[in-house]
């Protein structure tokens, strides 16, 4: 695995957050762009094993590109993604291969295994492989399959949806997973030398005050290497859209969200890479929150809150 450079990404008074962009530049000398790959799979809370319809905030494309539903082969998906990545890095290493949509280790491993066999030839250009899945869909065989990919890629990440540390909220949002399965999956991935990234959502229906802090606590206890922060968003073609239209969902404003994330960061270990500070969706899909600033502006708001109080990622862990 590629050694991680600490110096130029280390959080402190001048650099308040260890962002992925900073970490990639420290490690690879450049930023790498994700190339989204879609295998056209599903999730247990869509297929009937744990429910139907999926999580209330998830679109019919599984929060991905929907390319597989359009019958686009992986080669075509790669070519489109690489073209975009080459705008940033015209030569050499340029990309992160990211299996994003749905749960990529469910219902069985054969589609993922076939996909991995296809994409290995791109490892010289895309040194990092990232695979998203639910914690309750991550088995020892899945861990072994991904661990074998370290022969081809410099880094292999597995991205687990945590979303909330409250099992009751898991039920409210139709996810039907548990905090314990998150910890079990993270432990299993660690045993196989895989880097763990967790997704956290702020503002879910039923979430109690301090919910984002509890998610960071869970991430810290699981010793994850990376984390993504998302504000709750209402997208078209989701169950959440119906609830929002009926006035049954409260949305966070950008200032409240920036307050929540900046506070949570102070309790996040400084070595954890922050892969995302704020989410963004295509304008044609986005319904709410309304009047939300551009992603870069919210990013700046979060870091500014930290610098204004002379703080940074992980500063309060020692107090």
What are these regions (language model features)?
Residues 180-239, 255-278:
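Conserved C-terminal portion of the radical SAM core fold
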């Amino acid at each position: 695995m590629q050694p991680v450079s600490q110096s130029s990404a280390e959080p402190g008074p001048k650099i308040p957050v260890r962002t992925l962009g900073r970490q990639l530049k420290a490690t690879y000398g450049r930023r790498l762009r994700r190339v989204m790959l879609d295998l056209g799979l599903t999730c247990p809370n869509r297929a009937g094993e744990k429910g139907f319809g999926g999580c209330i905030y998830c679109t019919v494309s599984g929060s991905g590109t929907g390319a597989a539903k359009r019958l686009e082969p992986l080669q075509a998906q790669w070519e489109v993604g690489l073209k975009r990545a080459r705008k940033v890095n015209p030569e050499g290493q340029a990309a992160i291969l990211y299996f994003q949509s749905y749960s990529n280790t469910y219902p069985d491993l054969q589609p993922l295994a076939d996909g991995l066999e296809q994409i290995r030839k791109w490892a010289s250009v895309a040194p990092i492989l990232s695979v998203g899945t639910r914690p309750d869909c991550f088995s020892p065989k899945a861990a072994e399959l991904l661990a074998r990919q370290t022969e081809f890629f410099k880094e292999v990440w597995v991205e687990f949806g945590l979303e909330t540390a409250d099992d009751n909220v898991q039920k409210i949002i139709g996810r039907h997973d548990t905090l314990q399965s998150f910890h079990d999956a993270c432990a299993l991935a660690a045993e196989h030398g895989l880097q763990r990234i967790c997704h956290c959502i702020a503002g879910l229906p039923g979430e109690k005050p301090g919910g984002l802090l509890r998610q960071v606590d869970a991430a810290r206890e699981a010793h994850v290497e990376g984390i993504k922060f998302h504000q709750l968003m209402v997208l078209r073609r989701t169950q959440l859209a119906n609830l929002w239209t009926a006035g049954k969902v409260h949305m966070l404003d950008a200032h409240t969200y920036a307050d929540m994330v900046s506070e949570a960061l102070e309790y996040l270990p400084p070595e954890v890479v922050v892969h995302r500070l704020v989410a963004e969706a295509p304008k044609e899909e986005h319904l709410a929150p309304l009047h939300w600033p551009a992603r870069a502006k919210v990013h700046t708001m979060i870091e500014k809150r930290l610098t204004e109080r002379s703080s940074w990622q992980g500063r309060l862990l020692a107090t």
